[in-house]
Amino acid sequence: LMMNQFYDYYLSNNDEGKKIEFVEKNRTISFKINEIMYISSDKNYQDIVTKDNKIETVRIPLSTLENKLKNDGFIRVHKCYIVNQIYIRSILNEEIKLTNDITIPLSKKRRDEVLKEYLTYSRNNNSMII
């Protein structure tokens, strides 16, 4: 319950106005950054998954998205996944569980870096580390 209270508080006090726009040939898609839970990759196509379980597919390299979002609390956890850290519930050996119980793979080579960055992120955002 405490985690959910923090989570709701953080979301309501986060920078609500900050958005990211994806501009493609024939369309523009806009998201509030704090509504994106994670991004999964299938080669050149990326699925952007929101907290409402809406999925939009864009054709932008995952590395480009990683660079654009890394200063907004997103972290690359696998060659095919970028996760918004506000939605991380737990980090286990080879997976990350999100607040909606979705499990994202965590690559072994990125594990230590992800843990270190998540702890720093959590401390900077008033999480209690036990």
Report the location of each language-model feature.
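Conserved binding/recognition cores within well-folded domains
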Residues: 2-99, 103-106
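Short, surface-exposed, low-complexity cationic segments
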Residues: 115-117
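Intrinsically disordered, low-complexity protein-interaction/activation regions
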Residues: 125-130
